[in-house]
C-alpha cells in the first residue's frame, strides 16, 4: 500500500443507532485523519447515516474503515482520491 496522502469520504449506515457510541469511539481514535463529519439520524426508525471527510494514507484510512465495518449493524463504504 502507498503512503501517499489521499482525500476521501467514508459513508456509514447504522441499522441501529445503538452503535453510535462505538462508532464515535473509533472515529475519535482516528481524529488525526478525520477532517469533517456529519450525522443524520432517522427519527422514524432507529437508523442513521454518518459521513466522514478524511485525509490520510491508505493504511490508516483502511484501518478506520475496517474497524467501523466490523461493528454489528453497520455498513461502510469509502472512496478516496487517486492522489492528492
Predicted segments with their positions:
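Long, contiguous binding/interaction regions
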Residues: 1-84
Amino acid at each position: 500500500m502507498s503512503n501517499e496522502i489521499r482525500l476521501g469520504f467514508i459513508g456509514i449506515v447504522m441499522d441501529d443507532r445503538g452503535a453510535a457510541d462505538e462508532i464515535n469511539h473509533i472515529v475519535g481514535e482516528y481524529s488525526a485523519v478525520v477532517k469533517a463529519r456529519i450525522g443524520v439520524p432517522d427519527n422514524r426508525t432507529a437508523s442513521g447515516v454518518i459521513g466522514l471527510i478524511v485525509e490520510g494514507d491508505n493504511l490508516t484510512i483502511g484501518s478506520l474503515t475496517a474497524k467501523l465495518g466490523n461493528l454489528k449493524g453497520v455498513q461502510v463504504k469509502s472512496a478516496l482520491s487517486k492522489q492528492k
